[in-house]
Amino acid sequence: VTCDEAVIINPGAVDNEGKPLPRLAAIDCGVKHNILRELAQRFEVVWCPATTTFDEILKWEPDSFFASNGPGDPAHSGAATTARDSLAAAVRAGLPVMGICLGHQLMGLAAGLRTYKLRYGHRGANQPVVDLETGRVYITSQNHGFAVEDPDKGMLAPHPSGACSARGSNELEAPFKVRYVNANDRTVEGLDLIGKRAFTIQYHPEACPGPHDASPLFDRFASMVDDHLAG
């Protein structure tokens, strides 16, 4: 489900004032093209296979890092493990990082949390998500069967099989907090890293049913990258 080789999809991209856009390394774990379009409006995007190591990514001299959505169990070995390691290395290196869906789950694993199979997967375009910082409720589009455990409450609404990953250590070298939860079952829908320009969301901001819901999250990330480059 990943691309074959790294390529810049919009080389030489500039903003409305003719200034070069920041360069983003986007790890493709099964990325939707709508997400790439959203990113390409804000960044010069280096589209990288999920098997790309962080050392290989650094050769592109990125200003930021993105981990995409994708299918399957985030705890499986292989490409997902490489993507998780690259994500954790990007956080430790101080790059701004955003993760969506599977990218969110990989961030959870890198933070030492377990991922697990949900009793009832989140499917459809009407999943309510609460921003715990503002109290705002977003109506989101979701399509996933795994979740990241709550650091305080553990696995919420788990599948009867008990399928889950092992709990690990925090490879991010940064504390984190739960920022978003599902209003129906209270499962974790997003993390903010404390003291880092990094966050994740479990849902699809590029496909939200409301006229404005969630798509500004791409703008939030772009602002983080601008702040990073401004020092």
State what each model feature region is.
Residues 63-64:
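Short, Asp-centered acidic motifs that coordinate Mg2+ and/or phosphate
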Residues 21-25, 44, 96, 139, ...:
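Residues that mark the start of a beta-strand
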Residues 69-151, 211-220, 225:
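Cysteine-nucleophile active-site neighborhood
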Residues 136-195:
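Catalytic beta-strand/loop cores that center a nucleophilic Ser/Cys/Thr
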Residues 23-28, 140-141, 199-203:
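Active-site-proximal beta-strand elements of phosphoester/diester hydrolases
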Residues 1-60, 72-74, 82, 169, ...:
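RNA-binding accessory domains that recognize and position tRNA/RNA substrates
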